[in-house]
Structure formats: C-alpha cells, structure tokens
C-alpha cells in the first residue's frame, strides 16, 4: 500500500500546520510509540533536530520530530548530519515534539523562492481565511469570492509552479480573496519562466 496525498499550495500547508519551522536533523533512531489495536508495538522514527527558526507554533522550541518508519505509510526521510536545512510543517505533539508525514510540506530550505521564504513571516498567515482551490483541468471555477484558483498544474504541469513559488492568496478589504504577487523575482528567473 502506498501513501497518497493531495497536493497543496505552500500557503495551505502553512495554514493547515500547527508548527512550521526551519531546522536541520542531527540524528535519527527507531523508537516504540505504544501499541496498535492488536497489541503490536508501533515503531516510529525519531529525529533529533536543531531548530533554526519557528514561523508558527508553540512557545517552546521543537527538539524532536517523529514520523512513520517507511514511505509506504507516509514516513518522511530527512538527511541527518546537521548539514541540510529544511522547511518543515507538521502537527504539534506538545513538549517540544512534532509529527510529520509525506503529506506535510517538507522541502529543503534552499529550494524555496525568496518570496516563499518572506511569505512565511506573515503573508501566508494573512491568507489563512482564504481558500485555495486546485484546478486539475480546464475549465474550473471558483464557487465563492474567498477562493483563489491554483492553476499551476494546468499551466505548467507542476505543483511547484509560478503561483506556488511567487504568490499568496490574500483577503482584500471587501472580503474577497485574490492572488498577490510577493517580492518581484530576479529578472533572469522571470525571463526563464517566460520562455516557451
């Protein structure tokens, strides 16, 4: 059996998560986390992490991240060794702990666009009352004014497209929501995207 998740825009990932941090994994080990309904032990991977910055979450730094032992059950594998930095969004478990799955937004920090990094500070939060609706194929429509249509899949066949990288869906004063372009990307990057 495989893990299946529906794709989300980074803003949705931010809004849905209890905890959003920038961190690196220092070590990993398999731990027991209680038993399942049949009495079999449940194994989880425990990553000890070094939190660099918290964008959303509890007052206490996150020290440990837990995940399922294999990707088939949505487990996430992080590089340990403390070199690679990640943006990690997931569920709080209290007392400096969080749980992550493959359906959560977990990406190497250096793959984020400047706009995405900046949006983590407040812009995504400003749009949490808006709804981002993914358009899997044309035509697609919004059903209420507080929705933004996420078109990356149709226009670029990628969920990591232009709107994911450079836009946030923000509520305007009249209550409607609209895509708002963040920090202008560097010219070269912009030109590359314009290429047919």
Curated annotation (Swiss-Prot):
Cysteine pairs bridged by disulfides in the record: 3-74, 5-103, 15-128, 130-177, 135-140, 148-169
Keyword Disulfide bond in record? yes
A single Gene Ontology CC term:
extracellular space
InterPro entries of this UniProt entry?
A: Netrin_domain, TIMP, TIMP-like_OB-fold, TIMP_C, TIMP_CS
Q: Which PROSITE patterns match?
A: NTR (PS50189), TIMP (PS00288)
Gene Ontology MF term list: metal ion binding; metalloendopeptidase inhibitor activity; protease binding
Query: Where along the sequence does the record put site: Involved in metalloproteinase-binding?
Result: 16, 37, 43
Which modifications occur after translation, per UniProt?
A: The activity of TIMP2 is dependent on the presence of disulfide bonds.
The entry's Zn(2+)-binding residues are 3
Chain spans, region Involved in metalloproteinase-binding: 3-6, 71-72
Instruction: Tell me a GO biological process for this protein.
Output: response to cytokine
Localization annotation = Secreted
**NTR domain: residues covered:** 3-128
Give the signal peptide as a residue range, or say none if absent. Answer: 1-2
A Pfam family cross-referenced in the UniProt record is: TIMP
* UniProt keyword annotations, A-Z: Disulfide bond, Metal-binding, Metalloenzyme inhibitor, Metalloprotease inhibitor, Protease inhibitor, Secreted, Signal, Zinc
Q: What does this protein do?
A: Complexes with metalloproteinases (such as collagenases) and irreversibly inactivates them by binding to their catalytic zinc cofactor.
**Subunit annotation:** Interacts (via the C-terminal) with MMP2 (via the C-terminal PEX domain); the interaction inhibits the MMP2 activity.
Which family, according to UniProt?
Answer: Belongs to the protease inhibitor I35 (TIMP) family.
Write the protein's name.
Answer: Metalloproteinase inhibitor 2
């Amino acid at each position: 059996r495989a893990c299946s998740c529906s794709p989300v825009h980074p803003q949705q990932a931010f809004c849905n998560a209890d905890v959003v941090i920038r961190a690196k994994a220092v070590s990993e080990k398999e731990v027991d986390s209680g038993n399942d309904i049949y009495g079999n032990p449940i194994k989880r991977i425990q990553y000890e992490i070094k939190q660099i910055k918290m964008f959303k979450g509890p007052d206490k730094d996150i020290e440990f991240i837990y995940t399922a032992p294999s990707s088939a059950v949505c487990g996430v594998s992080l590089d340990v060794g403390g070199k690679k930095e990640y943006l990690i969004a997931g569920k709080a478990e209290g007392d400096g702990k969080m749980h992550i799955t493959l359906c959560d937004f977990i990406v190497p920090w250096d793959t984020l666009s400047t706009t995405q990094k900046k949006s983590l500070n407040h812009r995504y939060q400003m749009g949490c009352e808006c709804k981002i609706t993914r358009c899997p194929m044309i035509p697609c429509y919004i059903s209420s004014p507080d929705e933004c249509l996420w078109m990356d899949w149709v226009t670029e066949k990628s969920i990591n497209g232009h709107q994911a990288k450079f836009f946030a869906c923000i509520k305007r004063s009249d209550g409607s929501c609209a895509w708002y372009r963040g920090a202008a990307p560097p010219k070269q990057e912009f030109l590359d995207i314009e290429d047919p």
